[in-house]
Amino acid sequence: NGPHIATQAYEMGDPDLKSERAWNGELYARYETPATAFSATLYTNRFDNFIYEAETGDIEDDLPVFQYFQNDAKVWGIEFQASQRLANFGSSDLSVDGVADYTRAKISSGGGDVPRIPPLRLLGGVELTHASFDLRGEVEFNDDQTKTAAFETPTNGFTLVNASATWRPFGRDRNIALIASANNIFDVTARRAASFTKDFVPLAGRDFRVTARVSF
């Protein structure tokens, strides 16, 4: 037991926790052509003796107390990815892509929601690729998370807009690239529902950077 500064929590363990057991099921579909790619996954997990860390409502050393608990639980969700090439201009390709994921996790026998579960997330992007450069813009949407555990605060949804440009001065076959990126262009206040520190530290605001990447 003791304070964990990185998560801003006073954590309490339990030496009597049992081993977890899980039964997992997954349904997966995939389709791919030279111009189109699609995949979707539906999964469900049933846990015996699921171990999780939850807030108790107590304060110790000026930090909220989080304790490890154990109960049966059910987790299910969906994941989706797709990409489509829209056009080809000589050595350049224009394409769009998207990602979606959603997870639900509940403690069995009326135990409520598992803490720190991310909400529905949607991400879409458009990208122009060339032997010497890539241009990309993307939008990421995160829904509100109101399905929370006891003492856990709801999390407001947010939308991030990002853009980047990559230049490969010696072509795609050489592992040298200069990257200019702009993240959270509209400087929105964003908090991840799965973060221990969401109530204290939001995600970074508007951010511009230039980096050099050399791969070996």
Region roles according to the model:
Residues 1-8, 50-58, 103-115, 139, ...:
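Outer-membrane beta-barrel translocator domains and adjoining extracellular loop/strand segments
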Residues 1-39, 44-47, 57-78, 83-85, ...:
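Outer-membrane beta-barrel signature, preferentially recognizing the C-terminal barrel domain
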Residues 6, 60-62, 88-92, 171-175:
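Short, solvent-exposed loop/turn segments that connect beta-strands within catalytic domains
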Residues 14-18, 67-73, 109-115, 150-154, ...:
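Outer-membrane beta-barrel domain signature
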Residues 27-31, 80-84, 124-128, 163-167, ...:
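Residues on the lipid-exposed face of transmembrane beta-strands in outer-membrane beta-barrel proteins
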Residues 37-47, 64-147, 189:
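Gram-negative outer-membrane beta-barrel transporters
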Residues 46-48, 146, 167-216:
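C-terminal beta-signal and adjacent terminal beta-strands/loops
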Residues 154-160:
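Outer-membrane beta-barrel transmembrane domain signature
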